[in-house]
Amino acid sequence: MTSDQDAKVVAEPQAQRVQEGKDSSHLMNGPISQTTSQTRSLPALTQVPTTKVSELNPNAKVWGTHMLHLEASSAAVGVNAAWEEAPGHPTDCDQQVLGLDANGDGDKSRENAALPDAQEAEQTDMSTLALDHSEYEPLPENNDTGGNESQPESQEDPREVLKKTLEFCLSRENLASDMYLISQMDSDQYVPITTVANLDHIKKLSTDVDLIVEVLRSLPLVQVDEKGEKVRPNQNRCIVILREISESTPVEEVEALFKGDNLPKFINCEFAYNDNWFITFETEADAQQAYKYLREEVRTFQGKPIKARIKAKAIAINTFLPKNGFRPLDMNLYTQQRYATSFYLPPVYSPQQQFPLYSLITPQTWSTTHSYLDPPLVTPFPSTGFINGFTSPTFKPATSPLTSLRQYPPRSRNPSKSHLRHAIPSTERGPGLLESPSIFNFTADRLINGVRSPQTRQAGQTRTRIQNPSAYAKREIGTGRVEPSSLESSPGLGRGRKNSFGYRKKREEKFTSSQTQSPTPPKPPSPSFELGLSNFPPLPGAAGNLKTEDLFENRLSSLIIGSSKERNLSTDASTNTVPVVGPREPSVPAPCAVSAAFERSPSPVHLPEDPKVAEKQRETQSVDRLPSTPTTTACKSVQVNGAATELRKPSYAEICQRTSKDPSSSSPLQPPKEQKPSTVACGKEEKQLSEPVERHREPPALKSTPGVPKDQRRQPGRRASPPAAGKRLSKEQNTPPKSPQ
């Protein structure tokens, strides 16, 4: 009966408090449910009267041990005052507990509990009710009492906390950094109270605007307007400023201004700066009284009107300082750190190859307009060599052939000196470009009038390159690009791979042709037209020829751009063609006379040429707009043919390359190009001459060609020959003709 009643009694308060306790009361026995209820109440109350629960069931011998724990940690005397029970039962419990304390035996307590079981059955029921209610009801009672006790504290604490918080928010120290409150101020430094009440840390304390206004009015450092809508920091206006009073003024005279009977006493009078004097008073009212006295009664000082004003303690607004303590400091540190990473970190942390790369790339995040080679970005880095090393393998090899190719059009337009200056630095950079001049062969042939085949030009290239290597270094230094040759040789070789096979063929042909030409060098070339006109006296029967040569030079300059270049070509042509005629007409001493005899005199060798020359003259007269003497028309026809050949430059160069395999076929192809400016063999009549005449001319032509192609080779292909070498060779060719004359 008691266990069932105990289960019911324990289940009722648990159903009110915790649903889980009800389930446990149905599932468990009475003493177990009682123990659960006791254990729940133990940490909160440490109640001693719960020892009575062990006496409810005679089988509950185990709970005597827990009584000892309760006694050890119990405060029985203090808790008894809060119980709502009959006074007899707690005293019994206390006596039993004291008995336990005195004896220290749980068996005695259980015997004492078993003796009055029949008498105390009803009392135990009531006591269990009281105990259960004492287990659960005192908790809300204590909570209520604690809440009732803490509520006045909480009402006082939030008020004090709110007072301190508002005082801090409107203090001058905070307003110096709180940009939000400063932005909400009007001209009189008033801030709406609603703005202050909406601050987060004030909302947490209170949302009652009336309470906030009341607290603000109680603050001594804050001034609230009459309506209670605005608040501002207290204007500490205790200093009167006197302006435009010199520093040399005695302090006694300034103090005498404020020694009237009705004036309050000032605390301090001192010269501040810039002819300003500060007079400090105790309160703002004293300062106001002194200010009115000066403005209304004194008015003048040292014969000048007094300029006085009250100095309010200004709020030191630092826009660059933090708003709320640490945050803007962190922001400033962050901005400085980000600024430092782009400029100072690369020299500090990096070797020369890692961080400059990143710093070249990272500035694009904060300045997108800069390229990575912009000088202001490059200068902070100590390793400019790395930057050159970074760009040279990717860009410089590509730009160096491009720059050399860009120089081709001016070469084709300008005189020969410009070829010497522009061509050499582009090709003499590295051994790769020197070893592969085929990169530029075809472009040079097409751009420079197709005067000389690439076969003969390459022979001159190798010779002149070997002759004057020091000029290349000077020219390279002049260009300002001193770079490793390996970086540029590789792209040069890479570009020359397309023509490398043809270039090998050309070199083989070049060496074979030079070997065939080299054994017969003894015949010296004859002088040029310029030497004949300027240096030699007129020979017998050559006066008319000189005039025709002058006329030919004028028409040559009018037709072809760059007359000086063509005159150089004409000198080379004369050196080639005159020795051809030399062995057949030994009686003619001068080249001019030879040319006259070749064109006009009925020599037995040239008789078969005359009708062909006449036919060619008829054709050219129909084409030419300036008909003149047969000599001039023949020379003009040469220029017309030369112009036609210039229009067909690419195909003609290809023809030269195809036919250059035969020295016999290449030698007749060369004289037409050489004889464009010359009057000896006009135009392409050399091609139309009979084969015996051509074969008769071949050995002297081969004798003269080894030197001649080198001159004309340098004019189109100046990239391989320095200027000094070209000048020396031209002098060597022009000087020997003086000996036979």
UniProtKB/Swiss-Prot annotation:
Family matches, as CDD domains: LARP_5 (cd08036), RRM_LARP5 (cd12706)
Stretch list, region Disordered: 1-45, 86-160, 398-436, 451-542, 567-586, 599-741
UniProt KW NADP keyword: no
Ranges of compositional bias, category Basic residues: 495-505
Modified residues (Omega-N-methylarginine): 406, 421, 495
Gene3D superfamilies: Winged helix-like DNA-binding domain superfamily/Winged helix DNA-binding domain
Disulphide-bonded residues: none
Description of how the protein assembles with itself and partners: Interacts with PABPC1. Interacts with RACK1. Associates with polysomes via the 40S ribosomal subunit.
Protein name stated in the entry: La-related protein 4B
Organism lineage: Eukaryota, Metazoa, Chordata, Craniata, Vertebrata
